UniProtKB/Swiss-Prot annotation:
Organism: Synechococcus sp. (strain JA-2-3B'a(2-13))
HAMAP family in alphabetical order: UPF0367 (MF_01360)
Family to which this protein belongs: Belongs to the UPF0367 family.
Superkingdom: Bacteria
InterPro entries per UniProt: UPF0367
Bilayer-crossing regions: none
This protein's name: UPF0367 protein CYB_2632
Amino acid sequence: MYTLELLLKGNPAPIVVHQKEEEAANRAYQSIVNALQSGSPQSLELTCDRTGKKVFLLTGELCGVQMTSKSGSASPMGTRPGFLAQLQS
């Protein structure tokens, strides 16, 4: 299972979307990065494979995205990987 965490401007809680396949997660991640790099707001619709829920958002409200893979081992001392761990400190 792969997790995409989308950070919104002015919102401390990320939007989390789960993808079962690595290829699907990479495609979704790359489409978000491309939309952010384009500089003009675009609309994105993502579907969570775990819950089946959909989210529709404007890239102008995004300030970051992180992709992680769910492994069998827990992260050290209960911290989350990547830049979100620093926000919680």
